[in-house]
């Protein structure tokens, strides 16, 4: 069975990303693994002059599409004979650029990712799996009536809590209706309770269920958005979820993963789940059809545990990011993910725009 390490040596990958931290799921000295990103003070410290990392110097931070169109990036890809391109979040524009240059884009199609992630098309895609969602309906914004119960209102496209609104009063509702009267929205019953998430991998053979973590959401001063995810804690689920609830969570993740597999998906996806504090039931809240933002840090935690177990002679196989690449390269897979039950991170989302170094 070909390992990821040997596959990368003969079939290298370049991760092209606006933010270099998205690409740090593998050690930077991994043979056959390249990164192209923006030149920031943080990126320079991380790259430390490595020849497999190209940092683009511009006055403003470039997005992934702009990096792919940059001549320095294109020359770097050509000089290193790289055919495989990996990005954080695929778009139709990125697909067009890769096709033009005869690069193989490893990410699943942008159209499929959008269908799965968008709040309205997701309902049709889920089919019978909508049983895992809280009570919900699709409506035109202006037609929604206030019935004295709080609810969640979502636009079709939302990311890290943007486009998601907690409607607590009739005034809250009217403010949105005045701005977006004709917009289709998803209306969902508000479920009060802690949020959980995890990172899973669809391989060609099975669904790998990742480590459940507590989702830190809407915490000031790290964000000014009440539903924005700003961190993760891998130790809390053992304290907050019973064994039966963990099984219920894994059943939801597996069902979503199998639906993704049937749709042609490969690689990472995440789910967000809420525990109803009144009924102890778990509800599916969101599907992230892409590499979730917590992947890099989780993989670092797994790598640290792996080194410890290697020294003890009990090494487990792959990190979440390694499994992601293994799946995207369509390699045979006979491993499980490294389990972790400790570690946490906080992300500052309210901050000035990042300027590229000069």
Predicted regions and their residues:
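ATP-dependent carboxylate/phosphate-activation module, predominantly the ATP-grasp catalytic core
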Residues: 192, 200-256, 288-323
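A long amphipathic alpha-helix within ATP-dependent nucleotide-binding catalytic cores
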Residues: 228-279, 328-350
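Short acidic-hydrophobic, aromatic-tinged amphipathic segments that line or gate anion-handling sites
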Residues: 53-65, 133-141, 165-168
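Conserved ATP-binding module of the ATP-grasp superfamily
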Residues: 132-134, 152, 164-197, 223, ...
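Phosphate-binding site of ATP-dependent enzymes
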Residues: 168-224, 275-283, 341, 345-354
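ATP-binding N-terminal substructure of ATP-dependent carboxylate-amine bond-forming enzymes
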Residues: 1-111
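A conserved helix-loop-beta module that forms one wall/lid of the active-site cleft
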Residues: 99-165
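C-terminal structural cap/anchor segments
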Residues: 278-358
């Amino acid at each position: 069975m070909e390992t990821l390490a040997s596959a990368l040596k003969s079939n290298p990958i370049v991760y092209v990303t606006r933010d270099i931290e998205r690409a740090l799921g593998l050690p930077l000295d991994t043979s056959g693994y390249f990164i192209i990103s923006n030149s920031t003070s943080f990126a320079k410290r991380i790259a430390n002059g490595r020849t497999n990392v190209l940092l683009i110097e511009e006055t403003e931070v470039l997005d992934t599409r702009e990096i792919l169109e940059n001549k320095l990036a294109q020359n770097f890809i050509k000089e290193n004979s790289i055919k495989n391109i990996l990005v954080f979040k695929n778009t139709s524009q990125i697909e067009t650029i890769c096709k033009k240059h005869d690069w193989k884009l490893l990410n699943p199609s942008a159209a499929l990712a959008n269908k799965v992630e968008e709040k309205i098309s997701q309902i049709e895609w889920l089919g019978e799996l909508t049983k895992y969602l809280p009570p919900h309906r699709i409506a035109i914004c202006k037609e929604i009536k206030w019935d004295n119960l709080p609810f969640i209102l979502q636009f079709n496209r939302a990311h890290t809590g943007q486009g998601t609104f907690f409607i607590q009063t009739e005034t809250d509702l009217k403010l949105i209706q005045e701005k977006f009267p004709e917009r289709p929205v998803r209306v969902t019953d508000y479920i009060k309770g802690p949020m959980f998430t995890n990172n899973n991998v669809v391989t060609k053979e099975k669904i790998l269920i990742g480590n459940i973590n507590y989702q830190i959401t809407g915490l000031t001063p790290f964000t000014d958005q009440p539903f924005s995810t700003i961190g993760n804690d891998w130790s809390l689920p053992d304290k907050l979820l019973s064994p039966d609830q963990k099984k219920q969570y894994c059943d939801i993740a597996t069902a979503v993963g199998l639906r993704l597999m049937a749709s042609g998906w490969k690689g990472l996806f995440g789910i967000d789940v809420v525990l109803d504090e009144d009924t102890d039931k778990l509800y599916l809240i969101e599907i992230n059809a892409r590499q979730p933002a917590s992947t890099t840090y989780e993989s670092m935690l797994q790598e640290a545990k792996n080194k410890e177990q290697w020294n003890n002679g009990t090494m487990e196989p792959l990190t979440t990011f390694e499994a992601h690449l293994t799946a995207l390269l369509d390699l045979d897979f006979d491993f499980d993910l490294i389990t972790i039950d400790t570690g946490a991170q906080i992300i500052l989302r309210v901050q000035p725009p990042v300027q590229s170094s000069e």
